[in-house]
């Protein structure tokens, strides 16, 4: 949506939300979307007419302060550019092995390997999980692919007249992989963190797993943050037993909390599937609200319950992704925010306190444990106000925690550095 709006707005820079949306020049499907969600149109317009130009000026003034954070992120982006992307429909690309002979020659393709029969679906699942971990995945779960959770069009490698209404038969199973972003960098969001470290690692793991499956004779397609998704990840992750859907709209896992970037590999290898889990996230999110209270854009619903918030047929807390993306483009350092990941009480490294809390809370019918934990986080740990994360003069481009030492430009770089401050 955002790219489509941007392309249309660049061709019609004098258009404003006071004009009919039909005059903007976006596809009819997007016209209908904006009519259903007019606030998204207002936010998209603000992002490209105001926020991005202002951010460019801010980077001229403050950019040196974030240069090492940008450099750190750029390394992952550079590697990600080498990862392969499907160039033909699933019925073609998923059934061939892509081989790159050398960097200066186009990749070659060869047929799938001879199909290897597994003794049982249980052993197939065990093998897949073992190799996925060794390919770099921290978490692995398996479920059946749900046609309701495929994107309605735009699958990679597919022409416009492709029939997107039918799920490819070989997308029977979905293997969901998850990895965390670097913990000390996560806490320095929204200004110093990057999504690309975990994007790169989970994408690499998924593409390796795709290659493994194809060698064994099974068609496969990796859906990754670096090379694109043809399906929606969070509900598949929930069904694969990795976690539960939180107030933020992403899957919160017992091991990593919200600090988990995910990829999916679809295939037809028969495997034993996992079951959804319940460790109390839904009830905890109802009373917590730390992510919503901290969100600089106000994109996360403050409602006590998602009752009545039905999006695409499923009930979950509303997220205004237009407001969210607008703040992405306001921040300094690598693009994005990730503040909701950083502040979430579940997003903590393993230690005895965190392990005890996540063990006791689901087993406490009184709610005393969760109430006590929330009181401690809200009263014993300092954090910037939501407004502080904005640009000066309203805020100071605050970070939830100070960046790790290796991202502090003032320590390493011989540059004139201006640190943002309120009113400055």
Question: Model-derived features: where do they sit?
Answer:
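Flanking helices and flexible, charged tails adjoining ferredoxin-like Fe-S electron-transfer domains
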Residues: 1-20, 303-424
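Non-catalytic, usually N-terminal nucleic-acid engagement modules in DNA/RNA processing proteins
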Residues: 1-183
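Phenylalanine-focused residue identity feature
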Residues: 5, 9, 33, 37, ...
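Catalytic cores of enzyme domains
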Residues: 129, 138-349, 354-364
């Amino acid at each position: 949506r955002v790219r489509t709006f941007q392309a249309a707005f660049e061709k019609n820079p004098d258009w404003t939300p006071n004009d009919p949306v039909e005059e903007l020049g976006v596809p009819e499907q997007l016209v209908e979307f904006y009519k259903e969600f007019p606030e998204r149109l207002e936010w998209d317009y603000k992002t490209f007419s105001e926020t991005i130009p202002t951010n460019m000026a801010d980077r001229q003034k403050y950019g040196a302060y974030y240069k090492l954070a940008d450099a750190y992120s750029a390394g992952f982006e550079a590697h990600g550019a080498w990862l392969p992307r499907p160039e033909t429909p699933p019925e073609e690309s998923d059934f061939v092995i892509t081989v790159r002979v050398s960097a200066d020659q186009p990749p070659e393709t060869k047929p799938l390997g001879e199909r290897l029969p597994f003794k049982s679906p249980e052993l197939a699942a065990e093998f897949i999980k073992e190799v996925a971990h060794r390919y770099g995945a921290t978490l692995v779960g398996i479920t059946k692919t749900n046609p309701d959770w495929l994107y309605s069009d735009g699958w990679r490698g597919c022409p416009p007249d492709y029939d997107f209404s039918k799920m490819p038969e070989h997308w029977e199973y979905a293997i969901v992989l998850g990895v965390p972003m670097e913990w000390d960098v996560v806490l320095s969001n929204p200004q110093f963190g990057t999504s690309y470290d975990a994007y790169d690692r989970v994408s690499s793991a998924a593409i390796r797993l795709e290659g493994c499956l194809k060698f064994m004779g099974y068609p496969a397609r990796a859906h990754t943050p670096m090379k694109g998704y043809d399906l929606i990840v969070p509900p598949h992750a929930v069904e694969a037993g990795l976690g539960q859907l939180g107030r933020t709209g992403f899957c919160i896992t017992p091991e990593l909390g919200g600090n988990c970037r995910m990829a999916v590999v679809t295939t037809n290898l028969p495997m034993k599937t996992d079951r959804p889990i319940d460790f109390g996230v839904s009830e905890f999110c109802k009373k917590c609200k730390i992510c919503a209270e901290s969100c600089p854009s106000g994109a996360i619903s403050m409602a006590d319950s998602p009752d009545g918030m039905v999006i695409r047929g499923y009930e979950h807390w509303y997220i205004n992704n237009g407001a969210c993306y607008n703040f992405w483009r306001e921040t300094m350092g690598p693009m994005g925010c990730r503040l909701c990941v950083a502040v979430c009480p579940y997003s903590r490294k393993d230690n005895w306190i965190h392990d005890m809390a996540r063990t006791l809370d689901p087993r406490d019918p009184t709610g005393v444990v969760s109430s006590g934990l929330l009181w401690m986080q809200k009263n014993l740990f300092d954090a910037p106000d939501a407004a502080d994360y904005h640009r000066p003069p309203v805020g100071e481009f605050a970070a939830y925690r100070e960046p790790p030492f290796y991202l502090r430009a003032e320590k390493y770089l011989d540059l004139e550095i201006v640190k943002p401050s309120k009113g400055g």
